[in-house]
Amino acid sequence: MQATVPWLSLSILVPIVGALLVPLVPDKGEGKQVRWYALIVTLITFLITVAAYLTGYDPSLSGLQLSERVSWLPDLGLTWAVGADGLSMPLILLTSFITSLACLAAWPVSFKPRLFYFLLLAMDGGQIAVFAVQDMLLFFLAWELELIPVYLLLAIWGGKKRQYAATKFILYTAGSSLFILLAALAMGFFGGGTPSFEYTALAAKDFGTGFQLLCYAGLLIAFGVKLPIVPLHTWLPDAHGEATAPVHMLLAGILLKMGGYALLRFNCELLPAAHSQFAPLLIVLGVVNIIYAALTSFAQRNLKRKIAYSSISHMGFVLIGVGSFSALGTSGAMLQMISHGLIGASLFFLVGATYDRTHTLQLDEMGGIGQKMRIMFALWTVCALASLALPGMSGFVSELMVFAGFATDEAYTLPFRVVICGLAAVGVILTPIYLLSMLREIFFGKEKEELVSHTNLVDAEPREVYIIGCLLVPIIGIGLYPKLMTDSYRSSIEALVSRNLGAMEQVISPTAPLIRGQAPVPAIIQAPAVGAS
């Protein structure tokens, strides 16, 4: 469906052009005018994405909508192609929403404010482009464009070990991005037909199973770094350990979701035959994420690193949902990305706000501040309950959908489903233990004399309450009425799962020796029942 108004191009170009105009904003060096300018640009971008959803997006359709296509370099198959479907539209809205709140969270930044907001706006445009472009080379360019601002935001405004964290981030993410470029070139020039990198053209190509497996493996590494998947995760705790609050919000709220989105868009949608072979591995990796990261989070004494490992654990549910051949499970993975984006952004913002008051991240140095910071304690409590998947919150719905979808997924054998659900439940049990224990150590117990005498323990200010309130509205809204979000992508998810089931039935037919365990594909997969989804 062609767009009558170029909403998506505007949502990409407005923050990028806004970033380029930052040097022209009059300012006396304190950053006040630049702050307001950046906030206005991010709000305009958010309103553009909302207008795109309300005026040009039909949730009942599974195909591409709001599409724009302009030939760029036709001899090389390069095209400016953008569009949105159920996989991308919710994440575009999430990106513009969280970025506008991150801009407000950056209000106290006074060191090099022009450069800071320039990078923030450039990052906004790059991240929206990742979800909106419909050309694999454009996707690679947007993926790389987003890396540079993150690196500089870490290296310049980070903590004591900011150079180490920023360097590790760029080495992991930029190095793994090479696999995206190689896969894009291979898929664009092979498979028959004229060279093209548009998703629709790539989906129509006839790639052999061996070719798909090779591309899938490379893309899994690239996207696994960003998700992140254990053991490709070690950059994330270091990056979160040194980042400032607004950068935290962008890392947890948006950056990790790029990996989950890319798995659905490329590995599942464009390489369905390979996905039927790799899906069990995704399930196992998801369980490893959930349990390993939960146990590691439980042992952390640094507040930022504790929440960072909690994020890794929660993203394990995304892997299980992506690996399932159930519309319910895959829909749960999508909802988990959105839910974690909101909850992760809120928790990391509160970490930054608490550090501004206590000047420490060590739980051993905290305690007894609940009496002096009652509103802050209330905000922490609600966000922690959302993170541990309390009923009535978005996290409960998304995790329940993943569990129910995988448990009823007849594409996998019953023993495998029982084992995976049992192991994943261990992570669900560990989460409230380490989160509630964290709250107790921060706010309860005896006041630390050194903490009270050397810090200004003022309660939450209106700006902070407003930011958390804006994040809690969709968290609670989705928790009470999930259709508010799931209807926006249901049709696209059902079409994706149907395609993957069809590809799996071609690879694993009901009469194939796989069921007897003789085929070179995972014996934990069985042929789905007719009509299973």
UniProtKB/Swiss-Prot annotation:
Membrane spanning stretches: 5-25, 36-56, 70-90, 91-111, 115-135, 137-157, 169-189, 210-230, 244-264, 278-298, 315-335, 336-356, 377-397, 418-438, 465-485
EC assignment: 7.1.1.-
Key word Translocase present: yes
Subcellular location: Cellular thylakoid membrane
Superkingdom, taxonomy of origin: Bacteria
GO BP: any one term: electron transport coupled proton transport
One Pfam family, short name: Proton_antipo_M
Family per record: Belongs to the complex I subunit 4 family.
Designated name of the protein: NAD(P)H-quinone oxidoreductase chain 4
UniProt organism field: Synechococcus sp. (strain CC9605)
